[in-house]
Regions:
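Conserved beta-strand elements of the Class I
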Residues: 84-86
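Active-site-adjacent helical/loop segments in soluble small-molecule enzymes
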Residues: 27-81
């Protein structure tokens, strides 16, 4: 399962299909939060709660959206019971300071 951060990323399906032989994958297009480097309050609140609970910071461009999407799908019983889920944290934490500069005018902050 993949989580594109681009809005309108349907083209990725064809691109990926060129390189895979199996049909055991899919892209979840509902977790881009408006597109690349776009955020909303729900995402920021999730990221801050995740860090508080697990002591793991998430970046707002990639990993925060991935974790939000997977946790949302878990809550919706998307995955079969007993499914092993591996999430790979790809970094990006250096972008938090810049994002905070952009979102503080809305009264938001990534902790």
């Amino acid at each position: 399962v993949g989580f594109p951060v681009l809005k309108g990323a349907d083209f990725l399906r064809d691109d990926i299909q060129q390189y895979v032989k199996n049909a055991n994958w899919e892209l979840c297009m509902d977790y881009h939060f408006g597109g690349y480097a776009k955020v909303n309050k729900n995402l920021i609140d999730f990221m801050n709660a995740f860090k508080k609970t697990h002591d793991i910071p998430l970046d707002p461009v990639y990993t925060g959206k991935l974790f939000f999407g997977v946790f949302d799908l878990i809550a919706k019983d998307y995955f079969r019971e007993g499914t092993t889920i591996l999430l790979i944290h790809t970094g990006g934490l250096q972008g938090i300071a810049g994002m905070n500069q952009r979102i503080e005018k809305k009264g938001w902050r990534i902790d």
